């Protein structure tokens, strides 16, 4: 069986804000991560865990803060890209932002917002070609001709996010960082946007890094999931492994915090409390494979216990 192609490969990444200053903050601490072609890799964790920082680092937005490690895109270190290679990478890797209102220019019409990438990269030669491509993109995300000349404030939150998705797809990317793309949306339309992203992924063979707080939605859309806390990835596995067979205490704590819609079971639910200081014991920890494809940040002794429990 052919091994799947790695689109993104992060090796021992360290990233520090305000390095050398009193308020230095090590946002990413020795993180390694692979994202394969055509998959959706979900990244979950509490606010401040470093999820968005990883996504922005992949897109070269935080190059000045990286203090160690590598970020490879199709085998090339993105920090070394220059000239035509950098221009090509800007097209191949795109981002869908968390707040559809703030990420769209309120003074621009939809057709010009979506066409920004086309214009900047010289992907269309005539106005007719430009208009046809913009209309194709709007239809792809469930909008129509009537929306071309409207402004962002004339749309609902879900429609604005669809415009943001169309803009990201305009340059035909291979990889998309979706930074909490549904958290600012009404619950009633979150599933619509996620289903739209899945449909587009199948049509365009896209690879997603899906960053979110909503654990149930991450489970629904993701092939594999990584759990982050304090700048480290603590557990990586398939959606089924992480949700149905969590191993790391923090993952168990995170999942136990999900409220139940049943009021009786909700009253009986006992959340698991995670003590992060338990890992500040000076012992060396690294990502270790517990079951095939299921990795946990642990010491060698902890890994042996996890493996034994996994076979019970």
Curated annotation (Swiss-Prot):
It is found in: Cell membrane. It is a peripheral membrane protein. It comes from Lactococcus lactis subsp. cremoris (strain MG1363). The complex is composed of two ATP-binding proteins (DppD and DppF), two transmembrane proteins (DppB and DppC) and a solute-binding protein (DppA). The keyword Transferase does not apply. Part of the ABC transporter DppABCDF involved in dipeptide transport. Responsible for energy coupling to the transport system. CDD domains: ABC_NikE_OppD_transporters. This is Dipeptide transport ATP-binding protein DppF. InterPro entries: AAA+_ATPase, ABC_transp_ATP-bind, ABC_transporter-like_ATP-bd, ABC_transporter-like_CS, Oligopep_ABC_C, P-loop_NTPase. GO terms for biological process: peptide transport; protein transport; transmembrane transport. Its main location: membrane. Pfam families: ABC_tran, oligo_HPY. Residues 10-255 form the ABC transporter domain. Its EC number is 7.4.2.9. One of its GO terms (molecular function) is ATP binding. ATP binds at residues 45-52. Belongs to the ABC transporter superfamily. Disruption phenotype: Inactivation of the gene impairs growth on low concentrations of di-valine.
């Amino acid at each position: 069986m052919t091994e799947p192609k790695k689109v993104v490969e992060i090796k021992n990444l360290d990233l520090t804000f305000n390095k050398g200053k009193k308020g230095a903050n090590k946002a990413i601490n020795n993180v390694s991560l692979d994202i394969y072609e055509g998959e959706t890799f979900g990244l979950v964790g509490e606010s401040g865990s470093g999820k968005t920082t990883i996504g922005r680092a992949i897109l070269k937005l935080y190059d000045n803060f990286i203090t160690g490690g590598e970020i490879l895109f199709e085998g090339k270190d993105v920090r070394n890209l220059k000239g035509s290679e950098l221009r090509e990478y800007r097209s191949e890797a795109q981002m869908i932002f968390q707040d559809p209102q703030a990420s769209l220019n309120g003074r621009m019409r939809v057709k010009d917002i979506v066409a920004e990438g086309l214009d900047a990269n010289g992907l269309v030669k005539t106005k007719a070609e430009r208009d046809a491509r913009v209309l194709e993109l709007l239809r792809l995300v469930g909008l129509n001709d009537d929306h071309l000349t409207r402004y962002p404030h004339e749309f609902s939150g879900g429609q604005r996010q669809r415009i943001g998705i169309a803009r990201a797809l305009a340059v035909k990317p291979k990889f998309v960082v979706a930074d909490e793309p549904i958290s600012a949306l009404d619950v009633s339309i979150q599933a619509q946007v996620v289903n739209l992203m899945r449909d587009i992924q199948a049509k365009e063979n896209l690879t997603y890094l899906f960053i979110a707080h909503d654990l149930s939605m991450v489970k629904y859309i993701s092939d594999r999931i990584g759990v982050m806390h304090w700048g480290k990835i603590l557990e990586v596995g398939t959606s089924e492994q992480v949700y149905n067979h969590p191993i790391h205490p923090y993952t168990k704590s995170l999942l136990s915090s999900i409220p139940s819609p049943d009021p009786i079971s909700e009253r009986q639910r006992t959340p698991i409390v995670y003590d992060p200081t338990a890992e500040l014991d000076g012992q060396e920890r690294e990502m270790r494979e517990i079951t095939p494809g299921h990795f946990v940040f642990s010491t060698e002794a902890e890994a042996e216990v996890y493996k034994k429990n996994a076979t019970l």
